[in-house]
Amino acid sequence: MSRRRRADKREVLPDPKFGDLVVTKFMNYVMYEGKKAVAENIVYGAFDILEARRKDMGPLETFHAALDNVAPAIEVRSRRVGGATYQVPVEVRPERRRALAIRWLVNAARSRGENTMTEKLAGELLDASSNRGSAVKKREDTHKMAEANRAFSHYRW
């Protein structure tokens, strides 16, 4: 544990186009080397593609549906008990759920095969909103791991 005091949570401002805090967080995860304008163009470009491809839902609804489908409810954490390390399933706090979902979506998008990051991100968001894709698979794997280690759930802290 750190001996210092806990770091304060920084407030992020809502994004200019949709006025959504989660979209700003998402942009910050997409951003490289402080290039916010580039990240903004990528995310808004992906939202434009979503709007064109998916007529039944708006881009913001598709984005939030994708996040909900990727967010894990439970994960495993290592716990050392008497020389043995157990993978103990624990519930995920809401803030961490959202952070993991965003991280998994961005990483899954980066590893896709399309040409531009805008297309990759739009494709992954579309897949995740309809419960497919690498990010959803990552969530399923996490849940499977927690289910497999359910016997150790009494070691929860």
From Swiss-Prot:
PROSITE patterns on file: RIBOSOMAL_S7
InterPro entries, per database record: Ribosomal_uS7 (IPR000235), Ribosomal_uS7_bac/org-type (IPR005717), Ribosomal_uS7_CS (IPR020606), Ribosomal_uS7_dom (IPR023798), Ribosomal_uS7_dom_sf (IPR036823)
KW Translocase (keyword) present: no
Keywords in alphabetical order: Ribonucleoprotein, Ribosomal protein, RNA-binding, rRNA-binding, tRNA-binding
Alphabetical list of Gene3D superfamilies matching this protein: Ribosomal protein S7 domain
One function term, GO molecular function aspect: rRNA binding
Name of the protein described by the UniProt record: Small ribosomal subunit protein uS7
Native species: Phenylobacterium zucineum (strain HLK1)
Gene that specifies this protein: rpsG
